[in-house]
Each structure stands twice: as structure tokens, then as C-alpha cells.
Amino acid sequence: RDFCLSRGLGDVYKRQAQTILLYAAFGSEADLSALAEKAQAQGKTLAYPVCGEAYSLTAAVPGPDGWEMGQYGIRTPILSRSEILLPEALDLVLVPCTAFDADCFRVGMGKGYYDRYLPRCKNAVKIGIAFEAQRVEHAAVDEHDQRLDAYVTERGIYKWK
């Protein structure tokens, strides 16, 4: 499903983001391909996650022919044909979820890839991308789950206070 960006994400994106980690939508996740096209046209660096061993995540900037169907059937950059970015190089991280709450906690797919990776993104604004229907009263989180800076849905932006 294509995702219409709210003004809130647009403001963060325009001001702060030169190097962005986003994702190739899988299943019912919000599709960010329109944002990716616009960002690429503006000369921004776009990286995508690659799932690795021991539930690790790598940010990879794919080359022109640098895509494959990766683990879990997700469109993924081919590491050997990509530029690898350190987490500290990212300005903005856009994170998918299956559910989120007003405190900006997220529920992912259960493997913890993002929860292990996000603390290393010390310079990045971390924003969850979701549909309003995914908002819950209290997300079922564990001690390792990471709080995001904000969430953007088709209706607006939720910021953690």
C-alpha cells in the first residue's frame, strides 16, 4: 500500500535528512517507494537494511543492479554490489512496524533486528512508519525494545514527549 507522507515527516525529511535508512515494503507495510524516488532525485543517500547472521542489520546503499530477494522474501540490496554505511552516518531512520503506541514503542516482526541496530544510530532521528489502524493503547514491549522519536501515519505525526 502506497504511503502518503504527512507534513510532519516532510519537515524532518527536508531539514535533517541527507543520509536515510528506509525499507523496501514487505506484505502490508507502508510503501515508501514514492519517498525514495523523490529523495533520490534530490541527491540524498538512501540505504536499505540487510538482515544478517545473529539477527544483525547492515545499512546498504544498493548499486543500479544491486537487488535480490533476500531473507524472508524481502527485496534487499546485494552487499557485494552496495556501499555499506556505518550507523553513525545516518541522519534519518524510517522503521516499519506491526503495531505502535502513543509512547512511540513499536512491535516489529519479533526477531529484534531494529532493536539491536537502532541504539547504534546515535546521530539519526528514528521515525516509525505505520497506518493509523496499527496504533494500539499499549504496545507489548520487552526490555530490549527501542522507543522511537516519533511515528508518522496517514493522519499525522506522534512525537514522544
Regions found by a protein language model. Give the residues of each.
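A general structural motif
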Residues: A17-T19, G43, L90, N123
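Phosphate/pyrophosphate-binding loops at sites that engage ATP/ADP/AMP, CoA/4′-phosphopantetheine
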Residues: D11-R15, R81-P87
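Residue-level signal for inorganic ion chemistry
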Residues: L22, L46, L94, G110, ...
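Single conserved hydrophobic/aromatic residue that forms the stacking wall/gate
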Residues: D2-Y13
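Extended, well-folded interaction surfaces typified by the phenylalanyl-tRNA synthetase beta subunit core
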Residues: T19-I84, E132-H138
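Short glycine-rich anion-binding loops that position phosphate/pyrophosphate groups of nucleotides
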Residues: F26-S28, T98-A102
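Surface-exposed, charge/polar-rich loops and edge strands
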Residues: I78, E88-V93, D101-F105, R116-K161
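Charged helix-capping and loop-helix junction motifs
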Residues: G108-Y114
